[in-house]
Amino acid sequence: MEINHLEKINSKVVSYGAKLLPVVKNRTNDEIKFLYDFGFREFAENRLEDFKQHKEVYGDVNYHFIAPIQSRKLSEISQNFTYIHTISRVKEVDILGSLERNCHYLIQVNIDND
């Protein structure tokens, strides 16, 4: 992505009081560095393994987890991510309630019974 294009998009989004959240899954190190150098300090990731590689390079970034969660990985995810966007089951809420973590959670609620 060209920097001018990104600047225009980001400026428009910010003018509405929102912010862009780059999803870095399947991105190369050069692409992530471009976003980091642009000034982004929050990235979204959907794989714990990929996050670990990114965290080594970009340790001052807040990370958002954006994939369905496996209960057995929930503790590790909550330790490493600032936000979890994909809480969708009561079991996950119960597990998170038993953990003492400083993580923000976004809960998906299905109101259509799908």
Task: Please identify what each model-predicted range represents.
Residues 1-114:
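Conserved alpha/beta-domain cores
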